[in-house]
Every structure is written in C-alpha cells, then in structure tokens.
C-alpha cells in the first residue's frame, strides 16, 4: 500500500509563492509548478539534498576560508582547494591573430582543433573528435600520450599542416600544479583515469616527447591549461569584463582572476610587473577534509565508495554530471526496495551501477507539468513499464532534488569567488554538459547567486563557446605574443 501523501509547501529551487486564484504552487527561481502530491517517504529520502539559505551561507563561509588557505604560501600544503597558479597573466585583447593548434583532453571528450584568429569578430575553427579507447584510461602513460600524438598527426596531415610550424595549447582537464606556462605537474587523476607513470610528471613534456618521437610534425607545445582557464579566456575574447571561468559537466571546477600579490605560491608574486594572475581553484576537492558533511547524504557516501578515488573530489561528486545520475539511481532503488515506488518491482537495468544517465535528469525535467513523454521514454529504457502518475512525479521530484543541490552549491562557489575578488560587476564564462543541457540550471544558478550576493553586485552568466578549444588557442596566442615582446 502507498503511504499517505501531502501537499508540498516548499520548493526545490527556492521559496514558494502561492497564486491563490489558480490554487497552484510556483517555484521561485524557475517558475516551475510543483507536483501536487509526493509520497512522504520519498520526500523524506531526498530531504538531505534540499539545502536552505542558512546552509548555503555556511558553504560560502567555509569555502572562503579554504580558498584563502590555498592562496597563502604557509597554508597551501594543507589546503583542500589548492588554488593553483595557472601562470596565465595576460587576458585576450581581441587583437590576437594567426593560426594555433589546440588539443583538448577533458575526460569524456578528446579533440584536436585548428583555430585561425582572423579578427575579433572572425574566428575560424576546424576540429575533430576522437573516440577514446577505454583501455587507455587505465593503461600506461606512454600509451596514452602516443595515442594523443597519433591523433594530432592524423589531424594535421588531413588539413595539410604537417610542414607548418605551429604553437599548440594543451587543455588538460585534471588537477595540475603549474610550475610555468608550459610546465604542469599532474597532481592526481580524476574522472575515471588511472594511467601509470603520469602523476607527479610534467604532462607537457610527456606530450612533446610523444610528438617528437613521431618526427612528422613541427609543433611546439607552448602552454598547458585547465579547461576552466580556457573557458575564461574564450569568454574574455568577446566579453572584456569576464573574470571567472566555470565548468559544470563530467567534472566541475572554477578559475578566476586574482591580484598577483595575493597569489603567494607564484615565485614572483611580489615583483611581477603584471597585476593579475588566473587562479585554477580545483574546487572539486572542497570537502575532502570533512567540512561539507552537513550537505552530504547517505547516497553521496554510497556513490563515493564505488568511485576510483573514494574520499576525494567531494564537492565535485555532489554537483557534476558524472555522479548526478547515479545519485538519482540510488534513491530510486532504495525507494523501490522499501516498496515506495513502482510497487516494489525492480528491473535488471536499474540495478546496474551508472545505468541512470545524468542526461536522463535533463530529459525528465524537460517535461511540462503533468506531462511525461520524456519520463516515459527514460523509464522504458530502464525496463520500467506500466508506471502510474505518482511514480513519475516521484521520479521528477528526485531528479529536481539532485539537480537543484548541484546548482545551489555551484552558486555558493561563484559567490565565494566574487566576494573574494571584491568586484561589483563581472561576466562569468560557463561551459559543460550539465549547464548547457539541463533545462533549468541557468535559471537556478542565477536565482541563488542573486539571493547570496550583496546588493548592487551585477553579474552575467555567459555560455563560453568552445573554451577548451578556442581558449587553449588564445592562451597559446597570448604566450607567443608575450614572448615576441621580450
């Protein structure tokens, strides 16, 4: 028997406004009408995902402390948000010109690009994506970089570039300790990678050595960067006030423009003639020291246990696309096991780890209130048939709980950075599949940022076009131009 149900009086996305003459409930921040009835046990199960304003403020305070520790030389070693120096001090001016290569290794995506900067309004890009063999993700580092060089060679030969001397920007979307613009030490693998012989090594050297071993290309890797830095750079090419880059996709991270004098881990932080430095926060590790336990659930801990890096990347596991779908799946299977969904009948597919794709969350939440076309398709793919409306509403409610927490925590992170920069107006370049494809993520993020920021602070959320590709080329371009001025 289904337990008694009751009308929800709170919203996953913000405060509730009741329009009495329609007798409907509307979510603040997204104008999404709430489901009228949800099983109380299901509501209780997802309660831990519902972060209120007080908890969000606490997240901002704790993250502020961690970022300050990451920036300071004396506390950097024990900080969980490392705030690595990117060594990128020059933002695009819009006057960069020429052809540049970019190589983008970002977990689920691997691409080679040729970017031709013709003018600030005319940028030509040619790119090719390559399938990444699963075996390479846990094989040897040499095999990994030989594969990257092979794909780079194939791309260059197919575009008649094999005889051109080209600078390359390498977007490497894993935790890096940069010791120079073209020297980045891998701190740890994430996103399911575990290649041997790479952690603690300069990945630029590993790539350049693989290119040189082939002997068929005239390519010089001049810069390595994180995808967040590329996102910021690409956005700044068109939006001069862009000072923050954010990725919310397979993983999550942010970077921002800090005053050089505050970047104490930069050797020349007190003497550099350049006033600014892009800081790669690596905020995915926020909470690895336990400071986020008050916003984690038993489902988060269950997901963490089956990842290749248990106890690590705590913040990322709460908000990124790699884990959101699995969180939803665990809630569903728990509710089925307790008899609160689908009459206690479970399919083989839903029992498989990672079978509930994060894309399903976007699909389910794309349905209009009272409609279940996408929901039915998702359930069919999971082998769950003949569902009644309360089960479909419950699924949507669970998806909303997980996605709204992700947006709230991202909002906390961005507000922390804006407060740290102490600026009143900023553009934020954003990329990643969660932000791009979730139907309400932008609105949720914007809504909760406004609630947390002090009055008068203006911000703009901008989709950064091909940050990991064009952004890498722009870093290479600024590096080449800066070197030519020496």
UniProtKB/Swiss-Prot annotation:
Record pathway: Carbohydrate metabolism; hexose metabolism; Carbohydrate degradation; glycolysis; D-glyceraldehyde 3-phosphate and glycerone phosphate from D-glucose: step 1/4
Binding site for ATP: 128
Record annotation: effect of changing residue 252 to T: In strain: ZIM(S)e3_24
Effect of residue 380 to N: In strain: SC96e3_12.3 and ZIM(S)e3_35
Any single biological process term in GO: intracellular glucose homeostasis
Protein family: Belongs to the hexokinase family.
Name of this chain's protein: Hexokinase type 2
Organism the protein comes from: Drosophila melanogaster (Fruit fly)
